[in-house]
């Protein structure tokens, strides 16, 4: 595993409740979540981008509608005991599972593996916001973490991607502590490659 580096520069920012990010190295979900959170912090804190919650809001709306159908079925069955409530229950059950199907499609094809949507405001306030996406993957029983950065021009809507795939051992020390001064440069390198390409066009 990587040796833990010094606490200088940006490293002091990468804390959760003023404690280093420490996880169980054998818990794939915890490893992925800690790396995702750290990558998110780079864009939001270092580059001062503004997070957009549109994807999360969409999922919450679908889940809320599903819950409404479930609550209506429960209340209606209480006020009008079965079999009188049968037609309404049937409609609510069908609607609930329909919404669950929509949620599955939404998370699979809209959200995908995106965990951050961030906006970069135009300093002059003339052009639409540039949009940055972060998405990642870490397969079960695999040590290869893939981080993908997507840039969408607010002006031209052109889209460009950059990604890296590296072993998680590069970013955690023997105690399971995330070494931000090793991880942050990798994230910044992806971001800067897209930002530099944008300036040269």
Curated annotation (Swiss-Prot):
Cysteine-cysteine disulfides: none
Superkingdom as given in the UniProt entry: Eukaryota
InterPro entries in alphabetical order: Spc2/SPCS2
Transmembrane segments: 60-80, 87-107
Signal peptide start-end: none
Primary location group: endoplasmic reticulum
Tagged with keyword Lipid metabolism: no
Record membrane topology: Multi-pass membrane protein
Cell compartments where the protein resides: Endoplasmic reticulum membrane
Topological region Cytoplasmic: 1-59, 108-201
Lumenal topological domain residue ranges: 81-86
GO BP: any one term: signal peptide processing
Subunit and interaction comment: Component of the signal peptidase complex paralog A (SPC-A) composed of a catalytic subunit sec11a and three accessory subunits spcs1, spcs2 and spcs3. Component of the signal peptidase complex paralog C (SPC-C) composed of a catalytic subunit sec11c and three accessory subunits spcs1, spcs2 and spcs3. The complex induces a local thinning of the ER membrane which is used to measure the length of the signal peptide (SP) h-region of protein substrates. This ensures the selectivity of the complex towards h-regions shorter than 18-20 amino acids.
PANTHER family in UniProt: MICROSOMAL SIGNAL PEPTIDASE 25 KDA SUBUNIT, SIGNAL PEPTIDASE COMPLEX SUBUNIT 2
Function of the molecule: Component of the signal peptidase complex (SPC) which catalyzes the cleavage of N-terminal signal sequences from nascent proteins as they are translocated into the lumen of the endoplasmic reticulum. Enhances the enzymatic activity of SPC and facilitates the interactions between different components of the translocation site.
Family listed: Belongs to the SPCS2 family.
Designated name of the protein: Signal peptidase complex subunit 2
């Amino acid at each position: 595993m990587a040796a833990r580096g010094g606490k200088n520069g940006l490293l002091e920012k990468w804390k959760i409740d003023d404690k280093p990010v420490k996880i169980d190295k054998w818990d794939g979900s915890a490893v992925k979540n800690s790396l995702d959170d750290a990558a998110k912090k780079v864009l939001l804190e270092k580059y001062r981008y503004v997070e957009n919650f549109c994807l999360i809001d969409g999922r919450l709306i679908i889940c809320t509608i599903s819950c409404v159908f479930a609550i209506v079925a429960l209340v209606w069955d209480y006020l009008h005991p079965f079999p009188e409530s049968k037609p309404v229950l049937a409609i609510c059950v069908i609607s609930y599972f329909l919404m669950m199907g929509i949620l599955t499609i939404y998370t699979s094809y809209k959200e995908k593996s995106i965990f951050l949507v961030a906006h970069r405001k135009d300093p002059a306030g003339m052009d639409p916001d540039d949009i940055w996406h972060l998405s990642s993957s870490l397969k079960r029983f695999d040590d290869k973490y893939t981080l993908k950065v997507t840039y969408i021009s607010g002006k031209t809507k052109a889209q460009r991607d950059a990604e890296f795939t590296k072993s998680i051992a590069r970013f955690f020390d023997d105690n399971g502590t995330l070494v931000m001064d090793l991880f942050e440069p990798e994230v910044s390198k992806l971001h800067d490659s897209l930002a530099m390409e944008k300036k040269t066009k």
